UniProtKB/Swiss-Prot annotation:
This is Organic hydroperoxide resistance protein-like 1. InterPro entries: KH_dom-like_a/b, OHR, OsmC/Ohr_fam, OsmC/Ohrsf. GO terms for biological process: response to oxidative stress. It comes from Staphylococcus saprophyticus subsp. saprophyticus (strain ATCC 15305 / DSM 20229 / NCIMB 8711 / NCTC 7292 / S-41). Belongs to the OsmC/Ohr family. Residues 1-20 are annotated as: Disordered. SUPFAM superfamilies: OsmC-like. Pfam families: OsmC (PF02566).
Length: 141
């Protein structure tokens, strides 16, 4: 299988440490979720939310363009939750994907294209069957 892209990140210190990508595009302090703020650092959940939101919106935009939908201007907000797992000793993740598109298409079309994006998105593929994912889309003015 051909590799289209590869990147590396190295962490020291776990959730009280530091992470840096090999190209230094990301070079940040890592702190536990309760301590995260712009001055102290970020956490793995924020990084996951940022990556998944960006990847998913790219997939959604591509699906819209493939279906000749113009002017939809998709926006995706991804919420990552770190929650107790009653079946395990460690916590688990769940996510909500909340998308908005301009009213150049119907709610039914927006939901179909959102689902198509979920099938296409590499992050969605990687998490499928592993975490709960809620999909929501709103058609706005």
């Amino acid at each position: 299988m051909a590799v289209n892209y590869e990147t590396k990140a190295t962490n020291t210190g776990g959730r009280n440490g530091h992470v840096q990508t090999d190209d230094k595009a990301i070079d940040v302090a890592i702190v536990p979720p309760a301590q995260a703020d712009a001055e102290k650092g970020t956490n793995p959940e924020q990084l996951f939310a940022a990556g998944y939101a960006s990847c998913f919106n790219g997939a959604f935009d591509l699906i819209l363009k493939q279906n000749k939908v113009r002017g939809a201007e998709p926006e995706v907000t991804l919420t990552v939750r770190l929650e107790d797992d009653p079946e395990a000793e460690s916590p688990k993740l769940s996510v909500s994907i909340d998308a908005k598109v301009k009213n150049v298409l119907s709610q039914e079309e927006a939901e179909k294209y959102l689902q198509d994006a979920h099938e296409f998105c590499p992050y969605s593929k990687a998490t499928r069957g592993n975490i709960e994912v809620d999909l929501n889309v709103a058609v706005v003015d």
